[in-house]
Amino acid sequence: LRQAWPEKWPGLPLVFERAWQQLSLGVPRTGSRAHALLAFGRSVADQVERDGAQRHAQGQEPAYHNRLHIADTLVCMTYLLKASAYLKVAGASQASVAALALAIMAGHDFLHPGGSNTHPSEFEARAVQDLQPLMQAAGLDEADQEQLAYCILATDPVRVKAFHLAVR
């Protein structure tokens, strides 16, 4: 991906699809939780790609919080899920768990303006708010919306240490 960036970029939707395919979990049943989560993740990847391509064409795509960053997180999460499944970590081979994890990665810096927060969780909270219509359109239940929000808010650098301590 780094060699392709940005001139031969394959697109974030393709990266999302390949991440899912690497997990070898098949096609979730229509109407299932995993199906809704994948629909959400795909719509996020599509929107981030469109927004990023437009900003890139205008010379305004953020240097760090860009499409390549989202792709990096999708690849890393895919490796973590595959390693967890190999080690037989509870839930790691469940389609809904994997779909949720990939959806979180796709949305964690949704439409990020670049730069740093001026107050705690500023950009993360904005991402959660801006993702609400996509969550509803995908038919995510309240629990999944809350989990997505919780995990996205946890990516604020000032909150990371507290979250690490909480899961010890």
Q: Can you say where each PLM-predicted feature lies in the sequence?
A:
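His-Asp-centered metal-binding catalytic motifs of divalent-metal-dependent phosphohydrolases/nucleases
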Residues: T73, V97-S116, A127, A149-P157
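Conserved N-terminal diphosphate/IPP-binding helix and adjacent helical/loop segment
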Residues: L1-Q54
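Active-site flanking loop/helix segments enriched in acidic
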Residues: R42-V75, L111-G114
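Structured all-alpha helical bundle cores of eukaryotic regulatory proteins
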Residues: P113-G139
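Alpha-helical phosphate/pyrophosphate-handling elements in metalloenzyme active cores
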Residues: P13-L25, Q60-L100, L131
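Short coil/turn segments at secondary-structure boundaries
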Residues: G31-G41, E61, H65-N66, I70, ...
